[in-house]
């Protein structure tokens, strides 16, 4: 017998008892379905067995690592469904691209008819596997053997990925004869995937899954058309460039052609910024450019580059930060924990902002405020503005797309831009890179360089940042007149050099270690690219340093 400690309670179990069996006894104490377990601080899948005295901590679908496990498992189940309904080639070539709302978009690239009937067939096969609780089997293969397995199955994307792996073993999952590789943990069997739906969408299917906030129910699909088109455009650019996966990128690095790739991508981004500037001019009456996006999107560099484009077209842009319209500290709303909530709309003096902007629009001379972050007070320091015929205001802040932020301004006077780092690169066809991972790594590298902040601190506060984005930015994405994707297909290979030493500093006995370990494993797929190759106006420079802009 072995002694297991859970939530301060000690119990004895026979050696060889699965963590799944132990979790079943404790499930009643947890609101969400248990998905994983930490054994003496190390995450383990539930099918593993207890072998000695240990301390256990369970993770549910409401935890980040548990929710990721559910999504990963449902993805493999979905691809198994495609394999059984439309054949192995259809599953092999299908690409898991990105999320829209709580839907995971899988592009079948013409390998399956995109119809409601097809979606029902895939779903029906998935439900069969769920009902029969078909297990996900995990096996460690020697690296060369794993490469040979995927070579036989014509999964060149995975074979290429493993070519650059340093580890000697690779974990491969199998369900009912279908083999695949995933970078992360899985649930024990298909019976755990209780909440999902499948619908046809564009060139593939949308796999609808529950959110971390509401993990036991499906929410209606929130179609975000502009966001989809922006992300799919970036995916298409990667396909045309021949860089769809990390293996493709590593091939480019080894071929010595990275300098060309960097210049091509930078030129592509500059072209898109120029198109946005031209659209602004073509509208004729725009006086206020409202720029918003989530943390570490590169808003500041983008604003500078857009301003340069506008200058080439005869406009005189003036930057304004919505942060300067913060209410005085004592008036700032507090969150449910009693802490100041600087990210809600109530933290901004919306009325004063609108009053000032309306006066500027009518040609008046206005003294604009400056917020003193040390004293927590708004100050007036003689910063007067008066708009001439060719003047235009570039306004940056998280609430820029919210109609309430600029309620008094005529719609024709505003041009709204949504910017985010929408990673188009995949690890391989079936392992996408969440856009939040790229932004988290950007934030980590920048905060360490400019604020002396540790990676542990950045990871610790990231959930709070994400909640603010979900509440204040993402609901207004589709209000944008233009969307700009600031992600660069090579940037994770550049960030790797800066991020890895920061992540290795995180001790093993803190909660943030789990996320640090995941990110280190993720970065291990990439070869490094030196930052010296980046031009000094690159958006990536905002994070790694060396920008010609005041960022």
Where are these regions (language model features)?
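Conserved nucleotide-sensing/catalytic segment adjacent to the nucleotide-binding pocket
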Residues: 327, 331-374
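Glycine-rich phosphate-binding loop used to anchor ATP phosphates in small-molecule kinases
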Residues: 354-412, 462-476
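Hydrophobic positions on the alpha1 helix immediately C-terminal to the Walker A/P-loop
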Residues: 302, 306
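Short beta-strand-centered segment that lines the nucleotide-binding/catalytic pocket of NTP-utilizing
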Residues: 312-330
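Conserved lysine of the Walker
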Residues: 299
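Auxiliary tRNA-acceptor-end handling modules of aminoacyl-tRNA synthetases
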Residues: 48-69, 81, 86-101, 105-271, ...
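Hydrophobic anchor at the beta1->P-loop junction of P-loop NTPases
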Residues: 289-291
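Conserved NTP phosphate-binding and transfer environment spanning the P-loop NTPase/kinase superfamily
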Residues: 284, 407-551
């Amino acid at each position: 017998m072995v002694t297991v400690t859970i939530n301060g309670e000690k119990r004895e179990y026979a050696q060889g008892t699965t963590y799944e069996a132990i979790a079943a006894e404790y499930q009643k104490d947890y609101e969400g379905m248990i998905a994983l377990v930490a054994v003496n601080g190390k995450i383990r899948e539930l099918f593993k067995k207890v072998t000695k005295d240990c301390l256990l901590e369970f993770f549910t679908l409401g935890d980040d690592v548990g929710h990721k496990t559910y999504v990963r498992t449902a993805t493999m189940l979905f691809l198994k469904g495609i394999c059984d309904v439309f054949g192995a080639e259809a599953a092999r070539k299908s690409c898991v691209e990105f999320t829209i709302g709580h839907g995971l978009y899988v592009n079948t690239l013409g390998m399956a008819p995109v119809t409601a009937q097809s979606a029902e067939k895939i779903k029906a096969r998935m439900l069969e596997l769920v009902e029969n609780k078909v297990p996900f089997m995990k096996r460690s293969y020697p690296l060369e053997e794993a490469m040979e397995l995927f070579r036989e199955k014509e999964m060149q994307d995975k074979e290429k990925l493993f070519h650059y792996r340093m580890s000697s073993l690779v974990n491969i999952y199998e369900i009912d004869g279908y083999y695949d590789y995933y970078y992360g943990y899985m649930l024990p069997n298909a019976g755990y995937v209780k909440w999902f739906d499948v619908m046809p969408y564009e060139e593939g299917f949308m796999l609808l899954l529950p959110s971390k906030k509401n993990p036991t129910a499906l929410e209606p699909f929130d179609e975000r058309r502009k966001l989809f088109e922006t992300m799919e455009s970036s995916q298409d650019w990667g396909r045309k460039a021949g860089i769809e996966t990390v293996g493709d990128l590593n091939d480019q690095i080894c071929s010595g052609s990275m300098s060309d790739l960097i210049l091509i991508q930078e030129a592509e981004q500059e072209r898109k910024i120029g198109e946005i500037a031209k659209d602004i001019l073509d509208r004729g009456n725009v006086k206020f450019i409202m720029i918003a996006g989530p943390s570490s999107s590169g808003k500041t560099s983008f604003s500078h580059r857009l301003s340069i484009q506008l200058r080439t077209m005869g406009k005189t842009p003036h930057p304004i930060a919505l942060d300067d319209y913060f209410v005085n500290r004592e008036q700032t709303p507090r969150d449910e924990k009693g802490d100041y909530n600087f990210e809600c709309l109530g933290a901004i003096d919306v009325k004063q902002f609108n009053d000032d902007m309306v006066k500027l629009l009518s040609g008046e001379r206005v003294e604009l405020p400056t917020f003193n972050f040390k004293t927590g007070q708004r100050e007036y320091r003689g910063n007067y503005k008066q708009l001439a015929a060719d003047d235009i205001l570039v306004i940056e802040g998280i609430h820029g797309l919210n109609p309430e932020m600029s309620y008094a301004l005529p719609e024709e006077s505003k041009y709204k831009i949504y910017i985010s780092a929408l990673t188009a690169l995949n690890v391989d066809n079936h392992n996408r890179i969440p856009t939040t991972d790229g932004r988290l790594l950007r934030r980590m590298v920048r905060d360490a360089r400019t604020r002396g902040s540790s990676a542990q601190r950045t990871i610790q506060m990231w959930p709070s940042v994400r909640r603010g984005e979900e509440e204040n930015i993402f609901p207004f994405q589709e209000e944008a007149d233009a969307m700009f994707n600031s992600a660069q297909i090579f940037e994770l290979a550049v960030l790797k050099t800066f991020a890895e030493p920061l992540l290795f500093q995180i001790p093993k006995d803190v909660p943030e270690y789990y996320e640090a370990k995941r990110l280190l494993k993720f970065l291990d797929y990439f070869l490094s690219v030196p930052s010296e190759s980046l031009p000094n106006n690159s958006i990536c420079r905002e994070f790694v340093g060396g920008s010609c802009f005041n960022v």
